[in-house]
Amino acid sequence: MALLEIIHYPSKILRTISKEVVSFDAKLHQQLDDMHETMIASEGIGLAAIQVGLPLRMLIINLPREDGVQHKEDCLEIINPKFIETGGSMMYREGCLSVPGFYEEVERFEKVKIEYQNRFAEVKVLEASELLAVAIQHEIDHLNGVLFVDKLSILKRKKFEKELKELQKQQKHK
């Protein structure tokens, strides 16, 4: 396994529309394992392949259990996802490994139902609500070249751009 480099905003790579996965082989399995290791090392709960430079329609989500621990057996590997149903609306404070240090409220569907494939190309259906539904939507957005900051109001977007400039200034002075 290997730690992969996470691509940060404003890299144009994050705007790439990811392609369908067609080869469910050992290479894909290794990529998924490396993504998981990278996500855990970065203290994230979700990671889309494009965030590590792989323009493939795959993502992983590993929510912590009540004890706060993320168990690998709980990791969802979602490949070639498609929304079947969506419903409700909720606001959720989101962050992103590609936009480190910035968190903001984003409106999302409260419930989603998706069809996807696992690492063995088996078709699965998943119904999700609350945090899992939010994470699924956030990561699928990445597959379409969309970041959570794109969903902010103009006012919140300006706040984000200002904070980003401040952060970049601080990093230059280090």
Swiss-Prot record:
Enzyme Commission designation: 3.5.1.88
Cofactor(s) in the UniProt record: Fe(2+)
CDD domains according to UniProt: Pep_deformylase
Catalysed reaction equations from the record: N-terminal N-formyl-L-methionyl-[peptide] + H2O = N-terminal L-methionyl-[peptide] + formate
Assigned keywords, A-Z: Hydrolase, Iron, Metal-binding, Protein biosynthesis
InterPro entries (alphabetical): Peptide_deformylase, Peptide_deformylase_sf
Molecular-function GO term, any one: metal ion binding
GO terms (BP aspect): co-translational protein modification; translation
Residues annotated as binding Fe cation: 96, 138, 142
Pfam families xref list: Pep_deformylase (PF01327)
UniProt family annotation: Belongs to the polypeptide deformylase family.
Role played: Removes the formyl group from the N-terminal Met of newly synthesized proteins. Requires at least a dipeptide for an efficient rate of reaction. N-terminal L-methionine is a prerequisite for activity but the enzyme has broad specificity at other positions.
Protein name: Peptide deformylase
Gene transcribed to yield this protein: def
